[in-house]
Amino acid sequence: MKGLENAIRNLNSLDRQMVPRASIWAVNRMAQKAVSVATRKVARETVAGDNQVRGLPLKLVRQRVRLFKAGTDGKRSARIRINRGNLPAIKLGAAQVRMSKRRGKLLYRGSVLKIGPYLFRDAFIQQLANGRWHVMRRVNGKNRYPIDVVKIPLSGPLTQAFESATQSLIDEEMPKQLGYALKQQLRLYLSR
């Protein structure tokens, strides 16, 4: 068993930080991939506006996610912080108020607020007491303050997308990424 003893001696002589570095590298790669996959899915599948336009700008969804990477300083796990609050419609772009002159499903009476491809019926832009500008709309059923900010709900889609993306990536990709990372660390160690 001369070869086995030689292999054990070689493995023991390797840098003891090699495996932790490889695992940190793989964890960070998986976290970045989870953020990318989930934000693209949410941006592609979210429906906004009264005309039910599918899709949001990817930049708006990506701004709501922050990745804290794993490091060699003892923090061996990556953390993803997600702002799951609703997205105000004013963030979608420059707004135009149009009076509707045509007949149609959405353009039948009153004014229509158009922000990019998204239409919001009976909406208007107003500066709030805190100084921010928002798209507002009259809301039925609210007694005291019958107007409300127009928002696009993102809580459900973001939660679902991140849970499914992280679970599938951990099951399928993590072993491959760990293998790649260990090979890379070994190559770096042997090339010294």
Q: Can you say where each PLM-predicted feature lies in the sequence?
A:
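Short, Lys/Arg-rich flexible segments
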Residues: 1-192
